[in-house]
Amino acid sequence: MLLSSIVSFVADAAVVSTSIACLRHFTGFSLLRPANKIKNDKIRTGLLVYLNSGELIFNKGLEMVRNSSIKSLSSDSNRNIIDNSNNNQHPSSSSTSTSWKKF
């Protein structure tokens, strides 16, 4: 029971930190300047680690989305080339010969 509460708290904290990183990424609003004004070194260091962990999670997630979209686009374009080559066959041609349309 205690372990599930801790895991839930850590997951919620990661979501909040990642949301703050997303806000900074898309709007430019950053909490790093106000965080640097905190006088207590331990609290400031903890807050900076917390904010930087959200940045790390957001950047890794964004990188994964970009890589998967690039792979998806490249596989879709290859599929379109194959589909177009099959559609460009002349109706009277045999299955062994391919007639290409001129553009």
From Swiss-Prot:
Region (Disordered): 73-103
Location within or outside the cell: Secreted
Keywords: Glycoprotein, Secreted, Signal
Domain of life: Eukaryota
Keyword RNA-binding: no
Record carries keyword GTP-binding: no
Entries under InterPro entries matching the protein: Mitofissin
Positions bearing carbohydrate: N67
Gene Ontology CC annotation, any one: cytoplasm
Region forming the signal peptide: 1-13
Principal location listed in the UniProt entry: secreted
Pfam families: Mitofissin
PANTHER family xrefs: CHROMOSOME 16, WHOLE GENOME SHOTGUN SEQUENCE, DUF1748-DOMAIN-CONTAINING PROTEIN
Name of this chain's protein: Putative uncharacterized protein DDB_G0282937
